[in-house]
């Protein structure tokens, strides 16, 4: 299941420092004290503002890629879906988020082995957009 509603894209540019050094996920290294540039998340996540919307995920079918219930997805309606993309699709009147597989057979693949693949009719499958990013909070509100 997917909770579908649009969040307005803000024309206001909010930037934050983007550090030159990467952050080690393994053995820590000494921190660098300088900033490479400012990062605007609108620039980073939204390539086509007129074709982009945000939607919250619901359910557990995509947890193996780190997409959890409540996460905010950035969806581009103008992006052409390709094999392997994460997409928002309509199946039997319901919206769903799944990995699109075009070969060997058209499949909407959940990224959690507890869920079964969906084999939609190619004539009726509607893709509403490609998920280009998602925001996963690591700390509760």
Placement of each model-derived feature along the sequence:
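Catalytic Cys-His active-site segments of thiol-dependent hydrolases/isopeptidases
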Residues: 107-113
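Short, positionally conserved secondary-structure boundary motifs
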Residues: 1-63, 83, 94-95, 102, ...
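Compact nucleic-acid interaction/catalytic patches
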Residues: 90, 97
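Short, well-ordered loop/turn sites that connect or cap secondary structure elements
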Residues: 67-68, 81
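Structural motif
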Residues: 70-71, 85
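C-terminal structural segments of small proteins and small subunits
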Residues: 116-121, 126-134
């Amino acid at each position: 299941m997917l909770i579908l509603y649009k969040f307005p894209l803000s024309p206001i540019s909010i930037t934050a420092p983007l550090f030159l050094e990467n952050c080690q996920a393994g053995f820590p290294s000494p921190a660098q004290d300088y900033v490479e540039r400012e990062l605007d998340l609108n620039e980073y996540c939204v390539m086509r503002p007129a074709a982009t919307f945000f939607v919250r995920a619901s359910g557990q079918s995509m947890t193996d890629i780190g997409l959890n219930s409540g996460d905010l997805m950035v969806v581009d309606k103008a992006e052409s879906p390709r094999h392997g993309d994460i997409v928002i699709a309509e199946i039997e009147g319901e919206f769903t988020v799944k990995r699109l597989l075009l070969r060997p057979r058209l499949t909407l693949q959940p990224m959690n082995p507890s869920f079964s693949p969906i084999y939609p009719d190619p004539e009726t499958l509607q893709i509403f957009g490609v998920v280009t990013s998602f925001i996963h909070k690591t700390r509760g509100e």
